[in-house]
């Protein structure tokens, strides 16, 4: 699918969600899952497993590129407000879910940040032919996101807070929203376009994901003991 995108063979939403392409994606996920499940240590992740997780996350982001704010950024310029806000919240929740799942394997902060950096590098391929400046901007956003993830993971592993998984998941989702807001402001400045979104609207793109991220964090907690699931 990435190869077809680079060559311009297929564009738009429909090719991404056709059964044939979904089967290709499923095959990719199964191969990546094999690398993940056959890792030497079941208690931790090696570099191959980290790359597998990052690639799986990147594939999900690629499948949903039609509702990815970094790739569908013009929806913020063309006043498609519902789609624009929904894309940020959806992808922020996905970023939070990935954190809740991967952090249980005792990954280092560096490994966790690599998962997010690689996923951003994957989606930066999409606009690389026609809009190289956007590719660079997405890569920079990925670096900022990975730096924030590093700090969040470091805090998660050193704190004894009884709600650390929920707070961390909320911070991941909020960080995604914050990084995108910075990305949007940089994009509008570089391209000389006026944003219709005001300060409180942009602030909502950061605070709303915080709420959903906190709720997703409960998925990493045992409903009986209240402890983090391992």
What are these regions (language model features)?
Residues 45-97:
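Loop-centered beta-sheet repeat module
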Residues 2-19, 67-86, 125-131, 188-198:
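Membrane-interface interhelical loops and short amphipathic "cap" helices
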Residues 136-144, 151-230:
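C-terminal transmembrane helix-loop-helix hairpin of multi-pass membrane proteins
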Residues 44-58, 105-116, 160-172, 227-230:
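Membrane-interfacial loop-to-transmembrane alpha-helix junctions, especially the N-terminal start
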Residues 82-150:
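A contiguous, surface-oriented mixed alpha/beta subdomain in the mid-to-C-terminal portion of proteins
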Residues 1, 58-70, 116-128, 173-184:
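Aromatic-anchored segments of alpha-helical transmembrane domains
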Residues 1-55, 72, 76:
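Membrane-interface helix-loop-helix junctions at boundaries between adjacent transmembrane segments
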Residues 22-38, 88-104, 140-154, 202-221:
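Hydrophobic cores of alpha-helical transmembrane segments in multi-pass inner/ER membrane proteins
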């Amino acid at each position: 699918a990435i190869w077809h995108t680079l060559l311009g063979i297929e564009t738009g939403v429909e090719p991404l969600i056709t059964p044939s392409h979904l089967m290709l994606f499923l095959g990719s996920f199964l191969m990546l899952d094999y690398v993940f499940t056959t890792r030497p240590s079941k208690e931790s992740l090696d570099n191959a497993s980290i790359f597998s997780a990052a690639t799986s996350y990147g594939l999900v982001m690629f499948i949903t590129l039609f509702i990815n704010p970094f790739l569908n950024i013009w929806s913020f310029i063309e006043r498609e407000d519902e789609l624009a806000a929904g894309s940020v919240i959806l992808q922020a929740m996905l970023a939070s879910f990935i954190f809740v799942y991967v952090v249980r394997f005792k990954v280092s902060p560096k490994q966790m940040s690599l998962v997010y950096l690689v996923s951003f590098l994957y989606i930066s391929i999409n606009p690389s032919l026609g809009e190289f400046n956007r590719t660079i901007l997405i890569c920079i956003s990925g670096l900022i996101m990975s730096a924030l993830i590093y700090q969040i993971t470091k805090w998660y592993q050193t704190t004894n807070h009884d709600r650390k998984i929920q707070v961390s998941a909320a911070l991941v989702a909020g960080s995604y929203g914050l990084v995108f807001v910075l990305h949007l402001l940089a994009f509008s400045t570089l391209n000389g376009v006026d944003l219709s979104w005001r300060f409180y609207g942009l602030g909502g793109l950061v605070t709303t994901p915080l709420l959903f991220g906190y709720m997703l964090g409960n998925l990493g907690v045992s409903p009986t003991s209240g402890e983090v699931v391992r």
